[in-house]
From Swiss-Prot:
Keywords: Lectin. This is Agglutinin beta-2 chain. It comes from Maclura pomifera. It comes from the Eukaryota. D-galactose-specific lectin, binds the T-antigen structure Gal-beta1,3-GalNAc. Belongs to the jacalin lectin family. Formed of four alpha chains and four beta chains. The keyword Transferase does not apply. One of its GO terms (molecular function) is carbohydrate binding. Residues 1-20 are annotated as: Disordered.
Amino acid sequence: GRNGKSQSIIVGPWGDRVTN
């Protein structure tokens, strides 16, 4: 996705990963 941050929380239809 757009945000290549950290853990395995995938949000949105873009498959963005956010810090858990």
